[in-house]
């Protein structure tokens, strides 16, 4: 049990309007130390796994409270009789009591006013947590501890608004052990018998574009890549990604793309005004009243893939660069910056002069996890971001094809490794 208090890393008007809010709460956990009876326990240095329950007070009545339920893992950094330091990684769903649709004022015109909660747009959000966990044993059954870390909460544009929470925190508490006498004979396992593996994943989800727009737009992706397992818990490689985002559209109130307004001209006072008379946009050639094509809503990129294996669960962290990105020429701010001119298409690599939250970057991150459910079949959930701004959350199904290392293939087996309950005995 760890009571905590923290401070927000977020800035800007969405937080300044609440003035002096600080998060606080209580982290509870039920932990299962390593029994040294499974391969993944050995590979991760006998890590501890647990289930956590957190209660959060966001520090202002407009922001309300939250309850998060999540699995977590503690990776040993220092493990002695008198002191333990472990790295914590956690993630799961969280429910908030206050959001845009629970408040009395739901007028989008008051978006920046202190009368509205623009931090959350729905009840269920994703909760991510990482930090350092410290323990000092006092007796065989009791230890004093502390935890210092970071947590994030948002809905990944499944709902709007989606400013979300980013905070650091510190805590002090106690850990009680109930089975300190239970010991099992450690089992030694061989290394994973495969090196290269091919991943093929299809995923889909929905994105909301703007508060005043009730529609959700289809998003989907296809990934194919190959990774090499450097050791028993880490693999890296390259992958090809193709994304479709139905939210790249003129049929929404979101002002990220040029929408129904095409040309910008200077009026008699030298001010930039929207010109709604022209049929074709002089910047990108788009026709008024005709939505963007399927090709314009599609992106493709080449990504560096990183995988961190925790038994059946694998954490994913990808960084990619687009080599096909028609949407780079469709942004509202890009049209406004080039008012009254015919400009060449942007290069694939370009700066985002209006910062994060404006034009989306020419590169992307993807953070998530996949869980093996049968043989090499897995389910996956990931969040795709441009810089630190989420584009969407997706859910998918995939298959991994691991290839035996030279000299590791059992006689009579194919070149492809297939999981079994006790594969190390084969």
Model-derived features: positions:
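Transmembrane beta-strands of outer-membrane beta-barrel proteins
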Residues: 1, 47-51, 69, 85-91, ...
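Transmembrane beta-strands of outer-membrane beta-barrel pores
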Residues: 3-9, 32-34, 53-59, 91-99, ...
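Outer-membrane beta-barrel translocator domains and adjoining extracellular loop/strand segments
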Residues: 11-16, 62-66, 99-106, 156-163, ...
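Glycine- and aromatic-enriched membrane insertion/assembly motifs of diderm outer-membrane
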Residues: 18-60, 214-309, 313-314
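Residues that define the transmembrane beta-barrel architecture of outer-membrane proteins
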Residues: 20-26, 45, 63-69, 83, ...
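Residues on the lipid-exposed face of transmembrane beta-strands in outer-membrane beta-barrel proteins
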Residues: 26-32, 71-77, 89-93, 128-136, ...
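Outer-membrane beta-barrel "beta-signal"
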Residues: 28, 166-185, 390-426
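Repeated loop/turn-to-beta-strand initiation elements of outer-membrane beta-barrel proteins
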Residues: 37-39, 81-85, 136-144, 180-183, ...
């Amino acid at each position: 049990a760890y009571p905590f208090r923290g401070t927000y890393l977020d800035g800007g008007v969405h937080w300044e309007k609440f003035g002096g809010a600080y998060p606080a709460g209580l982290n509870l956990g039920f932990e299962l130390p390593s029994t040294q009876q499974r391969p993944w326990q050995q590979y991760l240095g006998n890590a501890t796994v647990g289930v956590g329950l957190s209660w959060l007070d966001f520090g202002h009545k407009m922001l309300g409270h939250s309850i998060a339920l999540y699995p977590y893992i503690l990776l040993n950094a220092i493990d002695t009789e008198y002191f333990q330091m472990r790295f914590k990684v956690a993630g799961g769903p969280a429910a908030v009591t206050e959001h845009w649709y629970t408040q009395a004022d739901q007028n989008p015109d008051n978006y920046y006013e202190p009368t509205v909660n623009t931090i959350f747009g729905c009840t269920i959000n994703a909760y991510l947590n990482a930090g350092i966990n410290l323990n000092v044993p006092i007796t065989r059954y009791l230890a004093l501890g502390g935890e210092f870390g970071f947590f994030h909460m948002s809905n990944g544009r499944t709902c709007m608004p989606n400013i979300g929470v980013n905070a650091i925190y510190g805590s002090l508490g106690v850990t009680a052990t109930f089975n300190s006498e239970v010991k099992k004979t450690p089992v030694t396992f061989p290394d994973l018998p495969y090196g290269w593996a091919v991943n093929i994943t299809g995923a889909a989800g929905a994105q909301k574009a703007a508060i005043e727009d009730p529609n959700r737009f289809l998003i989907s992706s296809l990934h194919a890549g190959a990774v090499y397992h450097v050791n028993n818990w880490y693999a890296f490689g390259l992958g090809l990604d193709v994304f479709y985002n139905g939210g790249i559209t003129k049929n929404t109130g979101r002002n990220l793309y040029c929408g129904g307004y095409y040309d910008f001209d200077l009026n008699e006072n030298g001010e930039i005004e929207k010109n709604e008379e022209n049929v074709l946009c002089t910047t990108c050639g788009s026709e008024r009243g005709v939505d963007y094509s399927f090709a314009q809503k599609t992106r493709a990129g080449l990504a560096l893939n990183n995988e961190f294996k925790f038994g059946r669960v694998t954490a994913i962290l990808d960084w990619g660069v687009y080599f096909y990105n028609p949407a780079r020429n469709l942004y509202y701010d890009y049209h406004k910056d080039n008012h009254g001119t015919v400009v060449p298409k942007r290069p694939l690599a370009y700066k985002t002069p209006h910062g994060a939250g404006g034009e989306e970057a020419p590169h992307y991150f993807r953070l998530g996890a996949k869980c093996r459910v049968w043989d090499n079949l897995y389910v996956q959930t990931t969040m795709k971001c441009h810089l630190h701004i989420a584009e969407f959350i997706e859910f998918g199904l995939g298959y991994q094809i691991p290839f035996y290392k030279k000299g590791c293939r059992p006689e009579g087996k194919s070149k492809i490794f297939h999981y079994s309950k006790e594969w190390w005995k084969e």
